[in-house]
Amino acid sequence: MLPELGFFLLLLATASAFFLALVPQFGLFKKNPTLINAAWPLSYIFTLATTLSIGLLAYSFAVDDFTLEYVAAHSNSQLPTFFKVAATWGGHEGSMLFWLFSLSLWLAAFAFFNRKNDRTFSAQSLSLLGLICFGFAVFILFYSNPFGRIFPAPAEGRDLNPMLQDVGLIFHPPLLYVGYVGFAVNFAMSLSALIYNQSARQIARSMRGWVLVSWLFLTIGIVLGAWWAYYELGWGGWWFWDPVENASLMPWLLGLALLHSLMATEKQGVFSYWTTLFSLLAFAFSVLGTFIVRSGALTSVHAFALDNTRGYVLLLIFFVLTALAFGLFALRAGSSSESAVKFQFISKSGGILLLNILLTIATVSTFLGTFYPMLFQAMNWGSISVGSPYFNSIFFPIITAILILMVIVLSIRKGQFDRTLLIRCGWLLIPSLILAGLMIWQQLRNNSALHFHAFAFVLLTLAIWLLFVTLWQNWRQIRLSQFGMILAHCGVAIVTIGAVMSGYFGSEIGVRLAPQQSQTLGQYEFHYRQFSNEIGPNFTAEVAFFDVTKNGKPYAEIIPERRYYDVRTMTMSEVGLDGGFWGDLYIVMGDSLGKGEFTFRLHYKPLIRWLWAGGILMAFGALFSVFGLRRKQEK
C-alpha cells in the first residue's frame, strides 16, 4: 500500500508542477494577483509531495519490500541498513527521483527567499522552474517509475552493486545532483530577465548567491567522487577523464565562469551577455550530464544503469530546453535596453574576461573529447577512444595561463598595474622556484626510477607562487568580503600542488608475494606478514596484512582485501591505505596464486591529500562568499 501512496504522491507532484507552469503565467497575462501568488503554494505542494514520495521509496528499501521491482534489483536483506537507504539512488529510477527531489528543494528555497521580493519576476521564475519540474516528473512517470510492482515477488533481492557499497557513494551522487539542479534557479532567473527585457546586471546580486551554493555542492561532490575513485576503484589515480567525470566537470567550469562574470556584471555592469550565456549553459550542461550517465551512449565506469530509450528522452528534454532558452536569448540580445559601459582591459574585469575565455576553451575541449567517440561511431567510422593524453595536452596550457593570470590580477589597482606590487610579486617567484625544485629533488632522491618533468616543475612553481602572492597580499588585513576569494584561490594552488606531485612523482610497482616476503619501494619496505579469510555481512574476504618500515623503522600497518559478493557474484579489491600529510602508501590486492600468494600493486602518492584539502578549501571559499553576500544584502 505504501508504494502505491508513493506513486500517488509522484502523480500529485506532477500535477502541481503542471499547474505551477501554467497558472502564474495566466495570472501574469491577465495581471491577476491571486493567480500570480498561486506560484508559492504550488511550489510548496510540489516539494512536499516529492519529498514524501522519495521518503516512501527509501522506507521500502529499509524494510526489504521486494515486491517493488526496483528494490529487488538493487537491494538485499543482508545489506547493511545505511547501504539500503543509499540504494534508493543506486539505480536509474531512484536516482532520477532523487534528481527531482533535489530540484524540489531548490524550488521551495527560491519560493521562500523571494516571498517578499518582486512578485512578478519571482512568479515568472517559479513558473519556469515548474515547467522544468513537470518535464522531469513526466519522464519519471512514463520511463523511470521506481514504484512498479513485481509478481511473484522474489524471496531475495539482487543486492546493490558492490562498487556502490561505500560510504563515499552514499553522499557523492546526492551532492552532485544538488549541485547540478541548483543551476536551474539561475537558468529560470535569466530566462525571466530575458522575457522582461532586463539586463543581467539588474539580477546579478540576487543570482550570485544561488550560483555560489550550487557551485559549492558541485565542488564537494566532485572532490568526494575523486576521493572515491582513488580509494575504491584501486587503480591508483583520482581522475580518469571518464565521460561521467567530464559530465560533472563541464557545468563546474561554466559555473566558475558564471561566478566571476556575475561579479563583474554586478560591480561594473560589464559582461551582461556573458553572464546570461553562462547561466543558460550551466544548467543545459547539467541536463546533458544526466543524459551521459543514463543513456548508455557513452561507456563509463560510473554508468551503472543504462537504457538508450530513457537517455534519448533526456536528450530530447535537453534540446527543448536549450532551443527555447537560446532562441529567446538570440531574440533579446539585439534589443536589450542596456546602455554601453566603458570597459578597461587592464583591470580586474579584463582578468575576468581572459579567465572566462580560458574556461570556455576548457569546456568546449572537454565536450569535444567526450562526445567525439560517440559521433565517430554514429557515423559508422568505427570506434575510437579519447583519453588522458588529449585532455592533459589541452588542460596543461590552460591551467598554466590561469595560474599566471591569477597572480597578475592581484597586481592591478584602479585600472592599472601597481609597479610596487608587480616587483614584490616578482621577488616571490624566486622562493617559489627554489621550493618547487627542492620538493621535486626530494622525490627524485628517494626513488632513482623517477625522472624530472619540466612541465611539472613549471606548474608546481606557478602554484606555489600563487599561494605565496595570495597570502602575502592579504595577511595584514583580511576583509570578510574577500575571505571567500582568498580561500578559493589558495585552494586552487593547493589542488594544483597535490595533482602535480602525486601525478608526476608518485611511485608504484607490481609484485607477487607470499606470506613473510618483502618488497622495497623507495624508502619504504613492505613486509607481507600473513593472510586470512574473513566473513562480512554480504561478502567473504581474503585479507592480507602488511607491516611497513621507513628507513628501517616501523611505520604503518596496511590491510588490503579482496571481497567476493555472493549475490552479485562479483569480486572487488578493497585498497589498503595509510594516509598522511606528506603522502599515501597504497596497496591493491590482485589475483590469488594459491597458498596465500597474491599479486599486489604497491603505490606511494606524495601530497595526494592536498588535492582533497584544496578542493574543500575552494568549497569553504564559496561558503564564506555566500555569508559575505548575505551580510551585504542585510545592510
From Swiss-Prot:
Swiss-Prot/TrEMBL GO biological process terms: cytochrome complex assembly
Keywords from the UniProt entry: Cell inner membrane, Cell membrane, Cytochrome c-type biogenesis, Membrane, Transmembrane, Transmembrane helix
Subcellular location: Cell inner membrane
Membrane topology note: Multi-pass membrane protein
The keyword Hydrolase belongs to this UniProt entry's keyword annotation: no
Main location per the UniProt record: membrane
Transmembrane segments annotated in the record for this chain: 6-26, 38-58, 93-113, 128-148, 167-187, 209-229, 239-259, 273-293, 311-331, 351-371, 390-410, 421-441, 452-472, 483-503, 570-590, 607-627
MF annotations from Gene Ontology: heme binding; heme transmembrane transporter activity
Pfam name, any one: CcmF_C
InterPro entries tied to this protein: CcmF_C, Cyt_c_assembly, Cyt_c_biogenesis, Cyt_c_biogenesis_CcmF, Cyt_c_biogenesis_NrfE, CytC_NO3Rdtase_biogenesis_NrfE
GO cellular component terms, semicolon-separated: plasma membrane
Family according to the record: Belongs to the CcmF/CycK/Ccl1/NrfE/CcsA family.
Function (record text): Required for the biogenesis of c-type cytochromes. Possible subunit of a heme lyase.
Name of the molecule in the record: Cytochrome c-type biogenesis protein NrfE
Species of origin: Haemophilus influenzae (strain ATCC 51907 / DSM 11121 / KW20 / Rd)
Gene: nrfE
